[in-house]
């Protein structure tokens, strides 16, 4: 076998020709790796030269193929010929397909990062709860509670990515996006119940001061917490991205670019948000470490433990308030904070042949999936252009303002006639 392979490579080398390879765009080649004829040479790279001047072509093509030179016939582009199924499949928009493939690849990378982060958070959160219980430290357990909020946020992000691939059903025609909102409400409620219990214990310790804390275990647990959060920061850090601490757009700026509201930015934003949460956990872990150091070497200052519980409980309440507010807005079908209804109406009015925008309703199926229903009236006499107007309005809502879905109703403008209701006439008489 080895001798046969060496003989094939030798024959291939002897067949090489230094003449430049000339091909036209109609030449056919077999790129199959399994060539039946051993006499044919194999190649992994191919250089194609396209020229208008036929004199540049060598008399014998270097690869043994007999290519026929043909002039470009642009008239074929003007002919309206029916396309076969195979041709239709080639006519698919490659940019759209490529963007979907890139989106799937991004989601896989994001899911991998967030899954690793969730596992680390879960393991260390359990370790902190056990260490805090053994050390009798409320500060350690409050830090674990804050870590629970970050773990919930990551799980909700993974849930949203998973639900985005699920198709709607006959009963749930919008899909299962609101399940993310329901999960957020349950997780925040659980966090508040645990926080209330820890605050109650902290108040009891502050009043009675009858407790002992194992400073060694508290110090070791706090030091491990700092190390874990540093690892989380490196894991979630995205080189080349600017890590902003604001997760919302200003209300007077309805958009920041094309398709700003779609999910191709959601992956980086999800990891970025988790990175910011990891920074917050790092600061809190450093605070617990300082308190543990004080209690370890100055046991009489054990009041630092309930004080840390108060401070960190406020931090947990502050970080979860935004989740509660966003959840309430979604449930009440309010307009997302980064969209401006008046600005969108003005943009729709600038479309040619649009007379007025009668109704515009905007809400969110879930976080990052705004939806719109709009009723547009056309200028009288422009009914024949309704497809063009609808296409422009749809492009504006989906691509410019980042709507996840939109429904557009069009009708010709009709001047309202002042008509008096028959009941009103009878009552007035």
From Swiss-Prot:
<feature type="transmembrane region" description="Helical">
    <location>
        <begin position="144"/>
        <end position="164"/>
    </location>
</feature>
<dbReference type="GO" id="GO:0071577">
    <property type="term" value="P:zinc ion transmembrane transport"/>
</dbReference>
<feature type="topological domain" description="Cytoplasmic">
    <location>
        <begin position="1"/>
        <end position="113"/>
    </location>
</feature>
<keyword id="KW-0406">Ion transport</keyword>
<dbReference type="InterPro" id="IPR036837">
    <property type="entry name" value="Cation_efflux_CTD_sf"/>
</dbReference>
<comment type="subunit">
    <text>Homodimerization could regulate efficiency for zinc transport. Interacts with TMEM163.</text>
</comment>
<keyword id="KW-0967">Endosome</keyword>
<feature type="region of interest" description="Zinc binding">
    <location>
        <begin position="240"/>
        <end position="264"/>
    </location>
</feature>
<dbReference type="GO" id="GO:0046872">
    <property type="term" value="F:metal ion binding"/>
</dbReference>
<feature type="topological domain" description="Cytoplasmic">
    <location>
        <begin position="165"/>
        <end position="178"/>
    </location>
</feature>
<keyword id="KW-0458">Lysosome</keyword>
<dbReference type="GO" id="GO:0015297">
    <property type="term" value="F:antiporter activity"/>
</dbReference>
<dbReference type="GO" id="GO:0005770">
    <property type="term" value="C:late endosome"/>
</dbReference>
<dbReference type="GO" id="GO:0005385">
    <property type="term" value="F:zinc ion transmembrane transporter activity"/>
</dbReference>
<feature type="topological domain" description="Lumenal">
    <location>
        <begin position="200"/>
        <end position="216"/>
    </location>
</feature>
<dbReference type="GO" id="GO:0009636">
    <property type="term" value="P:response to toxic substance"/>
</dbReference>
<protein>
    <recommendedName>
        <fullName>Probable proton-coupled zinc antiporter SLC30A4</fullName>
    </recommendedName>
</protein>
<dbReference type="Pfam" id="PF01545">
    <property type="entry name" value="Cation_efflux"/>
</dbReference>
<keyword id="KW-0472">Membrane</keyword>
<feature type="binding site">
    <location>
        <position position="146"/>
    </location>
    <ligand>
        <name>Zn(2+)</name>
    </ligand>
</feature>
<feature type="topological domain" description="Lumenal">
    <location>
        <begin position="135"/>
        <end position="143"/>
    </location>
</feature>
<feature type="topological domain" description="Cytoplasmic">
    <location>
        <begin position="238"/>
        <end position="274"/>
    </location>
</feature>
<feature type="topological domain" description="Lumenal">
    <location>
        <begin position="296"/>
        <end position="310"/>
    </location>
</feature>
<dbReference type="InterPro" id="IPR027469">
    <property type="entry name" value="Cation_efflux_TMD_sf"/>
</dbReference>
<dbReference type="GO" id="GO:0140882">
    <property type="term" value="P:zinc export across plasma membrane"/>
</dbReference>
<dbReference type="InterPro" id="IPR050681">
    <property type="entry name" value="CDF/SLC30A"/>
</dbReference>
<comment type="function">
    <text>Probable proton-coupled zinc ion antiporter mediating zinc import from cytoplasm potentially into the endocytic compartment. Controls zinc deposition in milk.</text>
</comment>
<dbReference type="GO" id="GO:0005886">
    <property type="term" value="C:plasma membrane"/>
</dbReference>
<keyword id="KW-1133">Transmembrane helix</keyword>
<feature type="transmembrane region" description="Helical">
    <location>
        <begin position="114"/>
        <end position="134"/>
    </location>
</feature>
<feature type="binding site">
    <location>
        <position position="277"/>
    </location>
    <ligand>
        <name>Zn(2+)</name>
    </ligand>
</feature>
<keyword id="KW-0050">Antiport</keyword>
<keyword id="KW-0813">Transport</keyword>
<keyword id="KW-0862">Zinc</keyword>
<keyword id="KW-0812">Transmembrane</keyword>
<feature type="topological domain" description="Cytoplasmic">
    <location>
        <begin position="332"/>
        <end position="429"/>
    </location>
</feature>
<feature type="transmembrane region" description="Helical">
    <location>
        <begin position="179"/>
        <end position="199"/>
    </location>
</feature>
<dbReference type="GO" id="GO:0031902">
    <property type="term" value="C:late endosome membrane"/>
</dbReference>
<feature type="transmembrane region" description="Helical">
    <location>
        <begin position="217"/>
        <end position="237"/>
    </location>
</feature>
<dbReference type="GO" id="GO:0010008">
    <property type="term" value="C:endosome membrane"/>
</dbReference>
<keyword id="KW-0479">Metal-binding</keyword>
<dbReference type="InterPro" id="IPR002524">
    <property type="entry name" value="Cation_efflux"/>
</dbReference>
């Amino acid at each position: 076998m080895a001798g046969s392979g060496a003989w094939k490579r030798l024959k291939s080398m002897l067949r090489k020709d230094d003449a430049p390879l000339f091909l036209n765009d109609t030449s056919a080649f077999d790129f199959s790796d399994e060539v039946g004829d051993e006499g044919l040479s194999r190649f992994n790279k191919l250089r194609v030269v396209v020229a208008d001047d036929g004199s540049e072509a060598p008399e014998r093509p270097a690869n043994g193929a007999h290519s026929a030179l043909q002039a470009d016939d642009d008239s074929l582009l003007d002919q309206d010929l029916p396309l076969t199924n195979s041709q239709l499949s080639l006519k698919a928009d490659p940019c759209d397909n490529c963007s979907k493939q890139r989106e799937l690849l991004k989601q896989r990378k994001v899911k991998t990062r967030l899954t690793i982060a969730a596992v680390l958070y879960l393991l260390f959160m359990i370790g902190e709860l056990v260490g805090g219980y053994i050390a009798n430290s409320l500060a350690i357990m409050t830090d674990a509670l804050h870590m629970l909020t970050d773990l919930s946020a990551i799980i909700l992000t993974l849930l949203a990515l998973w639900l985005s691939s699920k198709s709607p059903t006959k009963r749930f025609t919008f899909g299962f996006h609101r399940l993310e909102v329901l999960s957020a409400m349950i997780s925040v409620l659980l966090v508040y119940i645990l926080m209330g219990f820890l605050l109650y214990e902290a108040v009891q310790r502050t009043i009675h001061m009858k407790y002992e804390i194992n400073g060694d275990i508290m110090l070791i647990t706090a030091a491990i917490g700092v190390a874990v959060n540093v690892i989380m920061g490196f894991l979630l850090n995205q080189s080349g991205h600017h890590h902003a601490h604001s997760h919302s757009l200003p209300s007077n700026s309805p958009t920041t670019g094309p398709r700003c509201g779609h999910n191709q930015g959601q992956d980086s934003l999800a990891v970025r948000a988790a990175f910011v949460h990891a920074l917050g956990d790092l600061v809190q872990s450093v605070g617990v470490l300082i308190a543990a150091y004080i209690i370890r070497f100055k046991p009489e200052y054990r009041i630092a433990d309930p004080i840390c519980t108060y401070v960190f409980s406020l931090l947990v309440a502050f970080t979860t308030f935004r989740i509660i507010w966003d959840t309430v807005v979604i449930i009440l079908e309010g307009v997302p904070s980064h969209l401006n209804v008046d600005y969108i109406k003005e943009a729709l009015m600038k479309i040619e042949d649009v007379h007025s925008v009668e109704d515009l309703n905007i809400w969110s199926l879930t976080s990052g999936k705004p939806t719109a229903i709009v009723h547009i009236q056309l200028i009288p006499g422009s009914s024949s252009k309704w497809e063009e107007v609808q296409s422009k309005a749809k492009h504006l809502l989906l691509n410019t303002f980042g709507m996840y879905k939109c429904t557009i109703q069009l009708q010709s403008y009709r001047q309202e006639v002042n008509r008096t209701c028959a009941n009103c006439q009878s009552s007035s008489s």
